[in-house]
A protein has these predicted regions:
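RNA pseudouridine synthases
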Residues: 1-321
Length: 321
């Protein structure tokens, strides 16, 4: 038998979510069967799994040590990647993600920002391997592999939940910088619907709603135009897959370097001259609203991430910085 006392770190999550982390190799069907048979209890009583855990709750697993060991897998994704940390407190962390790094794993063998973050937190003694059995830090805003910039993550359950809720409610201002083809002279807000083809991982911008499509709103303002390009600041109102890339391409201003939605001839020119392999899109700024309790330290604050060197060099040479 093993006993888990719920601490402030684990409090606030569903009981079955905690069990999935603690016995991370066990099928969900096994966990629910153990709950039904009272082999796993909450505060000495039978539980369904959908209970919200509170600090001080007592979880008991009436399972053999061999069974627990069989269904538990320790964190093994240690990395030594140095993170560009923009802000950190006890509950949240903001990281400037480089181009080429996954935000989250796409396959089991992948290394992503999440693994680098967990390694950093363990090495800095902000987290222990035992902590990882009941709580895993996670990111709240995912960027494409080849999009750089600010990624926000929760270090504690309270931080993760509060931050995730703010992104869900769209109360955090998300501002991107991108280099687009063509001259844009005036600020604009464009709207439409986005339809994602899961098979090709590509999206289509529609001007009429279609079953399965999502409403999108993108605001942008030109910072400077010169030599056939515009440095644009984009305010992402909604945040859907490839929204900025596809939406700007649909109005005739594809991102420089975007091989999925961009102009192939323009991309070839930049690849030959600058060895550019990906879109020039950077999550440059986060604006927090008035925050209380867990996020009070970032209330009404703004955080910025510097442009990657290649983006800065190209923008400077094109005369838009």
């Amino acid at each position: 038998m093993q006993e888990i006392k719920i601490t402030e770190q684990e409090a606030g999550q569903r009981f079955d979510k905690l069990l999935c982390k603690y016995l991370n190799k066990a099928p969900k069907s096994f966990l629910y069967k153990m709950l039904r048979k009272k082999n796993i209890t909450l505060n000495g009583k039978k539980a369904s799994g959908n209970e919200k855990l509170a600090k001080g709750d007592c979880v008991k697993l009436f399972l053999s040590d061999e069974t627990i060991q069989k269904f538990s897998e320790a964190f093994s994704g240690y990395t030594n990647v140095s993170l560009d940390i923009l802000y950190e407190d006890e509950d949240i962390i903001l990281i400037n993600k480089p181009v080429g790094m996954l935000s989250q794993k796409a396959a089991r063998s992948d290394e992503s920002l999440v693994e680098h973050l967990i390694s950093y937190l363990i090495q800095s003694h902000a987290l222990t391997e035992e902590d990882l059995r009941t709580f895993r830090p996670s990111i709240c805003n995912r960027l494409d592999r080849n999009t750089s910039g600010i990624v926000a993550a929760g270090k504690s359950m309270a931080g993760l939940q509060s931050l995730s809720q703010m992104f869900h409610d769209r109360t955090i201002g998300k501002y991107y910088l991108c280099l687009t083809a063509g001259i844009i002279e005036k600020p604009s807000q464009v709207e439409g619907w986005l339809f994602k083809d899961e098979r090709t991982n590509k999206v289509e911008i529609l001007f009429q709603e279609r079953p399965g499509s999502a409403r999108i709103i993108t605001e942008y303002r030109p910072i400077k135009s010169h030599d056939g390009v515009t440095l644009l600041e984009v305010h992402l109102i909604t945040g859907k897959t490839h929204q900025i890339r596809a939406h700007l391409a649909s109005v005739g201003h594809p991102l420089i370097g975007d091989h999925k939605y961009g102009a192939s001839q323009i991309n070839r020119e930049y690849e030959q001259k600058y060895h550019l392999q990906s879109q020039l899109l950077h999550a440059a700024r986060l604006q927090f609203p008035v925050c209380t309790q867990t996020l009070c330290n970032v209330s009404k604050k703004e955080f910025t991430a510097p442009l990657p060197k290649q983006f800065y060099r190209i923008a400077a040479e094109k005369g838009v910085l």
